[in-house]
Amino acid sequence: MHNIFAKMKNIYYIYAMENIKLKIARIEKSLSQQELADLVKATRQTIGLIEKGKYNPTLSLCVRIARALNKTLNDLFWDED
């Protein structure tokens, strides 16, 4: 349980830096920001801001994005140091 809280804390790193992993995963799936947004019930603007590191998504949104891209949360959001 402690490990999940530590990882949840790390999710805030995407607020401070560009989330290139998310952008690459989206492009590999040949999805536009709008198409991904539609799949995860978000706006295109939200996806764009997450990719730029200017929006801190909820854990729920992170899970929906990861599922839509067939990736894990670790793959997209958590920096494994």
Predicted segment positions?
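Residues in the helix-turn-helix
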Residues: 35, 46, 75
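N-terminal flexible/basic segments that precede or flank functional cores
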Residues: 1-17, 28
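Short, Lys/Arg-enriched C-terminal cap helix and immediately downstream tail that follows
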Residues: 24, 59-60
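Short basic helix-loop element that most often maps to the first helix and adjoining turn
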Residues: 20-39
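Short, conserved catalytic or interaction motifs in soluble domains
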Residues: 52, 78-81
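Recognition helix of helix-turn-helix/homeodomain-like DNA-binding domains
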Residues: 43-55
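DNA major-groove recognition helix of helix-turn-helix/homeodomain DNA-binding modules
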Residues: 60-75
